[in-house]
């Protein structure tokens, strides 16, 4: 080797040590990265660190200062080998905002951001394929960690604190990773396939979508989803009137400028808003970085902070590059000492890295899209370590490896999969017992006809037979004093598409004039609440078969063929008869427009939709007569519903129900009105609150229900968040030849009107609320005594 080679090597080594060194900003107590700190070098222009606190100095032989939100300003002189800059939290830092008269420069900038929102939107204009890697770690919160590490320095520290310190030094509480491919084709075709996931202690795909559920993929929609809740975006149309914007800083880059803008909801503005900082780049006035958290803390004890970083990718557009989430689970308390104040809570920190972005690739033309937005591959939990090392951004450190090892061993010893299986079944309203499930919905129920209904339902679980299910139930009503029972068998042909065949036999009550929903109503659904008031029922012996499947992920059909016997118990007769036999076929078609579905293993989880939901049901039946002839009937029923969020104001819910029926048949084969009148009972949306359940029946009818609920008024009391709302319902219908039926009822030939006002949230607790409402019937079918048109009710609300 010549001297020139030796000199050249020395020069390279010297350059490597003096130039272009990667440095990191970290919290002195938690060792966590500090995002978007501003670096002020002595001989260079100021710039920002990235989402992981990483930055690079061209020349490290210089002093520099660092400023970061909520941290003490620090001046640094690097010594040999330094790569981590530790900053100390400024625990007394507050957001002091002074509003001055005149033109607000931040609003001028934000107006340009809002004007360019659609152009910069990642899911507009260009299709793409990208790869993503996510990692989430759960540890003790920052303040608790600081207290533990400070207390350990005392002369005689508590042994519990020593154990806590040793634990926190070696491992975390929980870790999860996932890797996925993201596909998008304009205008709205989108899907994400999770190819790999790994969760400490758990092998179930239920946790595979954890990263996707934490925050939105981008920050450009009118509503931003944070932990499943919707917040008004500060760059949404109209946000200049809703949000206060303050220009804090400007950072000059090579060809453009980055503005740092603080934002929060304006005073006396009542909406679910965010607060944080936007870093706006003058290249297209796009988001370069954003920090956001809910302005009003959640009463559930869960706080969350999100951070996103964008890059001008492939010289085409700004695109998400890194996503970060911090979630504080303040209800998950952790005690580390003997003193009362020696406790903390669980804190999760995670990052998602987006790479290999390709805009409008030819491969996109070969992809098949449906409404399954996220799908977990069948082998995603069986990925080799070699593949994982290739998918990860960085190798796992010793604490992360230790977490996997310890938690996996603990889970295996304690059989955590068994408890997870129990929790999944319990979420469906069933309790697993060995190879069977007990259906809680069959244990107790109430309606105005049966009064208190007690019973038991039991069915086989997947542990016994996966493709086949057998079940049976019985019940007894204290009102009608009659035993009901039934049995069924379900063959799951394809769980992913919801394709199944169900055979059933039952002897049970059935509401006269009811229509069948495509999906079984939930415990707190409007249909379940209305069922409390149903008092006109017939005893029905029925056997048949039902086939159901999904044509698309948001569209399904259900075909039912049955033979049933109706026995009216309340004195009702048609043509002198109270018992009827019928052969019936039913076809139900359901379509939820633009609904997104997550396919996790074999489980389909709806993510909801902001667009209308349609259901069409057609019934065709034949009733044999004494003369060996048949009386035929047909029923066509249409229902449409939608929930619309009016940004910054509230939510509008509306539904339409209409039907047509023909045939000379009993009342059961026509339509009962959706009604729920009873003073001081529970208010039932999408029903006539002032109408008795047996007051109206129709052969043809149409009803519209609307309800607008304003955003909650923020108060200082956690138990009180008042929400004003209005209700209006209208119906019209007809029923000729009422005299053929021996009971008295009306039809809405002249049009039925009612309106109401309510105040919910007088008392709130967690995800539930309670309030009061008053509803009034007016028009042709109102009572001459105006006081009898008023129906007071209790308004309840549940959010999950």
Task: Spell out what each predicted region is.
Residues 34, 56-63:
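Short Pro-Gly-centered beta-turn/loop motif in secreted/extracellular proteins
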Residues 41, 65-77:
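A short, solvent-exposed loop/turn motif at the edges and junctions
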Residues 92, 96, 100-258, 265-273, ...:
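Structured extracytoplasmic
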Residues 21-28, 53, 85:
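A short, amphipathic beta-strand motif
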Residues 229-231, 367-800:
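Exposed, low-structure sequence patches enriched in small/polar residues
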Residues 21, 28-43:
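Short, ordered, surface-exposed loop/turn motifs in non-cytosolic proteins
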Residues 44-54:
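Short, acidic Ser/Thr/Gly-rich low-complexity loop/linker segments typical of extracellular
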Residues 22, 78-101:
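Extracellular beta-sheet/turn segments enriched in Thr/Pro/Gly and aliphatic residues
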């Amino acid at each position: 080797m010549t001297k020139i080679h030796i000199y050249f090597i020395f020069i390279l080594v010297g350059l490597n040590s003096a130039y272009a060194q990667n440095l990191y900003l970290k919290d002195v107590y938690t060792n966590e990265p500090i995002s978007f700190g501003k670096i002020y070098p002595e001989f260079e222009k100021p710039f920002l660190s990235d989402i992981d606190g990483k930055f690079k100095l061209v020349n490290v032989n210089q002093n520099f200062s660092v400023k970061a939100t909520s941290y003490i300003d620090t001046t640094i002189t690097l010594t040999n080998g330094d790569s981590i800059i530790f900053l100390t939290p400024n625990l007394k830092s507050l957001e002091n905002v002074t509003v001055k008269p005149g033109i607000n420069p931040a609003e001028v900038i934000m107006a340009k951001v809002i004007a360019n929102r659609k152009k910069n939107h990642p899911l507009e204009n260009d299709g793409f394929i990208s790869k993503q890697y996510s990692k989430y770690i759960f540890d003790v919160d920052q303040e608790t960690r600081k207290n533990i590490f400070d207390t350990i320095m005392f002369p005689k520290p508590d042994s519990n604190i020593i154990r806590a310190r040793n634990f926190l030094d070696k491992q975390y509480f929980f870790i999860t990773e996932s890797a996925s491919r993201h596909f998008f084709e304009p205008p709205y075709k989108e899907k994400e396939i999770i190819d790999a996931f790994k969760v400490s202690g758990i092998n179930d795909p239920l946790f595979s979508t954890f990263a996707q559920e934490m925050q939105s993929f981008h920050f450009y929609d009118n509503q931003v989803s944070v932990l499943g809740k919707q917040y008004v975006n500060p760059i949404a149309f109209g946000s200049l009137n809703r949000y206060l914007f303050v220009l804090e800083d400007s950072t000059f880059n090579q060809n453009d400028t980055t503005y740092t803008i603080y934002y929060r909801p304006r005073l006396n503005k009542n909406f679910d808003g965010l607060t944080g900082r936007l870093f706006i780049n003058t290249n297209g006035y796009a988001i370069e970085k954003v920090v956001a958290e809910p302005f009003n803390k959640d009463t559930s004890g869960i706080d969350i902070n999100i951070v996103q970083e964008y890059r001008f990718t492939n010289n085409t557009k700004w695109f998400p590059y890194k996503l970060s989430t911090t979630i504080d689970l303040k209800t998950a308390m952790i005690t580390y000492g003997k003193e009362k104040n020696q406790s903390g809570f669980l804190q999760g920190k995670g990052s998602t890295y987006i790479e290999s972005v390709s805009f409008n690739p030819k491969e996109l033309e070969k992809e098949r899209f449906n409404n399954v937005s996220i799908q977990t591959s069948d082998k995603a939990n069986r990925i080799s370590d070699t593949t994982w090392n290739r998918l990860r951004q960085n190798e796992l450190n010793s604490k992360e490896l230790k977490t996997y090892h310890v938690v996996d061993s603990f889970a295996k010893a304690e059989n955590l999969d068994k408890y997870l299986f129990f929790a999944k079944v319990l979420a469906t309203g069933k309790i697993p017992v060995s190879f069977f499930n007990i259906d809680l919905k069959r244990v107790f129920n109430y309606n105005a006809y049966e009064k208190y209904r007690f019973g038991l339902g039991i069915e086989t679980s997947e542990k016994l037979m996966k493709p086949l299910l057998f079940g049976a139930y019985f019940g007894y009503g204290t009102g009608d004093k009659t035993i009901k029972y039934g049995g069924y068998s379900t063959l799951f042909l394809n769980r992913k598409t919801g394709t199944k065949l169900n055979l059933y036999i039952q002897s049970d009550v059935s509401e006269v004039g009811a229509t069948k929903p495509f999906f079984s109503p939930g415990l707190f659904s409007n249909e379940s609440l209305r069922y409390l008031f149903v008092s006109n029922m017939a005893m029905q012996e029925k056997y048949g078969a039902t086939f159901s499947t999904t044509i698309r992920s948001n569209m399904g059909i259900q075909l039912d063929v049955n033979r049933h016997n109706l026995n009216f118990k309340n004195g009702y007769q048609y043509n002198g008869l109270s018992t009827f036999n019928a052969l019936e076929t039913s076809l139900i078609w359901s379509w939820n427009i633009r609904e997104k579905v997550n396919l996790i293993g074999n489980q389909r989880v709806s993510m909801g939709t902001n667009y209308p939901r349609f259901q069409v049901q057609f019934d065709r039946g034949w009733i044999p007569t004494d003369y060996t002839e048949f009386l035929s009937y047909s029923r066509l029923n249409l229902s449409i519903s939608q929930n619309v969020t009016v940004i910054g104001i509230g939510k509008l819910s509306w539904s339409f129900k209409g039907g047509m029926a023909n045939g000379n048949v009993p009342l059961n084969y026509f339509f009962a009105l959706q009604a729920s009148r009873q003073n001081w009972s529970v208010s039932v949306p999408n029903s006539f609150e002032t109408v008795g359940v047996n007051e109206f029946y129709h052969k043809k009818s149409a009803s519209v229900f609307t309800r607008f609920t304003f955003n909650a008024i923020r108060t200082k009391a956690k138990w009180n968040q008042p929400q004003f709302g209005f209700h209006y319902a209208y119906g019209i219908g007809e029923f000729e030849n009422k005299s053929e039926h021996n009971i008295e009822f009306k039809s809405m030939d002249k049009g039925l009107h009612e309106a109401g006002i309510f105040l919910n949230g007088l008392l709130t607790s967690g995800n539930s609320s309670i309030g009061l409402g008053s509803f009034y019937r007016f028009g042709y079918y109102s009572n001459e005594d105006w006081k009898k048109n008023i129906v007071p009710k209790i308004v309840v609300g549940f959010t999950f």
